[in-house]
Amino acid sequence: MNFVPHQYQQYCMNRIVQDPAVGLFLDMGLGKTIITLSAINELKYGRFQVKKVLIIAPKKVAEATWQREAAKWDNVSHLRISTVLGSTSKRIRALHTPADVYIINRENVVWLVDYYKNDWPFDMVVADEMSSFKNHRAKRFKALAAIRSHITRLVGLTGTPSPNGLSDLWSQVYLLDQGERLGKYFTHFRERYFEPGRRCREVVYSYDPKEGAEKAIMDAISDICVSMKSEDYLELPEIVYHDIPVALSAKAQRDYNELEKKMVLDLGDDHVLDVTSAAALSNILQQLANGAVYTDDGGWQEIHNDKIEAFIELIEQLNGKHAIVFYNFRHDLDRLIVALQKTNLHVRQLQTSVDELDWNAGKVDVLLAHPASTAYGLNLQDGGNHVIWFGLNWSLELYQQANKRLHRQGQKNRVIVHQLICEGTRDEDLARALLMKDAAQQYVMDSLKARVDKYRRQQ
C-alpha cells in the first residue's frame, strides 16, 4: 500500500530525521508507527546516518504491531525486522540475526543493557510508549539512562506523557536530553517546580506544582517535544479506525487451530453449511479468538489470554483517557472486569441511565458495554472519544450504530476506534467483512466456508 503522509505526519517525520532526540506526543491511532518507520528508512537508506535501530515496546506491541505496519506500507516493507522475544537463547539468536530494526519488550531492557554492557550496538533507539520510563526509580529507566551516551538518536512516542502529573515528565525528558532542560537530578527538578502538598510533620506524601510550573516546564521542553492537539489534525476524518494486531503465542495458536478444526469437522463431511450452522460455528470461532469458550454446564473455559494482555496494554497507552469498550460474550465481560481490577481506573458496566450520566460527566474511565445495548438512543459523546472493540461483531448495523454513540453531534474530538484483531483467527475475517459494508454478510459466509473447506481437504 502506498503511504501518503498527512501534513502533521510529514512534520513529525521531518523532526525525527532532523533532530537527534525528539518526543512525539500523539494520540494512539494517528500513525506514530508508520511515521517512525518512514523516518528510520530515510535515516538508514536515504541519508545513511543510522546503522542499527532498537525499538522498545510493550510486549504485545513488540510481538506484532511494528512488523504488521512495516509489511503493510510499500515505502518501508523492505526493512528487515528482528523480534527479540522469548527465552534467553531465542533473544540472543534474534540479536545476532542481520536486520535493520530490532524490537524488544520493555521488560527486557535491563537484560539487554547488561548483555551488551559497553559494547552497545544500537545508534538509534525508539521508546514506543515513552511513559513506560516515567518512574525515575525504575530499573528500566536507570538501565537506559546508563547507556544513553552510546545512543546517537532517541525517539520517544506516547499519547499522554504525564498521566499522573507533571512529575512524570522528568525521567522521559532526561532520556531525550540527558538533563539539559529539566535538570540532571529529579530532586532538583522537584525543588524548582513543586512544593510539598499532603504531609505529616516532616514526612511529605505528595508534591503540588508551583504556580506557573506547568507553563514553565512546557516552555522548557517545547523545542524537543512535539505535542499536538485535535485542531492539528483537521485534515483527518472525524472518525479514525486503528487496527491492533494481536499475535497469539505458539501454544495459543495451536490450541485455536485444533479447536477450530474440531468444530469444523464435527459438522460432518456431507453437512451443508447453512445460515444456522454458519452462525453457530462463527459464534464459537469468535469466542476462541477472544480467548474463552462456553462449556456445556453453562460456565466458560479460558483458552488464551493474549487478547486480554493486548487490551490492558492499550488501556495503559491511553494513559487515563476515557474509553468505551464493546464486548460480545459474557465471558468477555467477566475477564475484562478481572483484568481491569488490577488498574486504578474507575470501571463501570453500562446498565442504567445513571451509568450513562456518570460516563458523560467524566466520572467513568472505562465503560463496558454490549453493542446491542447501545445501538440506538444513547448519547455518550461527552464522556470520551476512544472506542475499543475487544471482539468485533459480524453485524454491520450494530457496529456502525455502536460507534455512533461517540461519533455524533456534540463530540468535541475526533473519535478513534481501536480494534483488537487476533492474527490467524476469525477476527481477521470479521474485520474484512465490516469493510465491505453491503457485501459484509456474504463475506462472513464465504470466509467461513473457506475455513471449512480447508480442514475437509486435510482429512
Predicted regions and their residues:
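Regulatory input/activation interfaces that engage signals or partners
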Residues: 326
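Conserved SF2 helicase motif VI
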Residues: 395-413, 434
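Conserved, function-defining core regions and hallmark residues within catalytic/recognition domains
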Residues: 285
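SF2 helicase/translocase NTPase motor core
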Residues: 1-142, 146-150, 186, 190-209, ...
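Conserved P-loop NTPase motor "coupling/switch" region that bridges the ATPase
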Residues: 52, 78, 124, 141-230, ...
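Short amphipathic
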Residues: 237-248
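A short beta-strand element within the Helicase C-terminal
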Residues: 168-171, 379-392, 416-419
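Residues immediately C-terminal
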Residues: 132-135, 156, 408
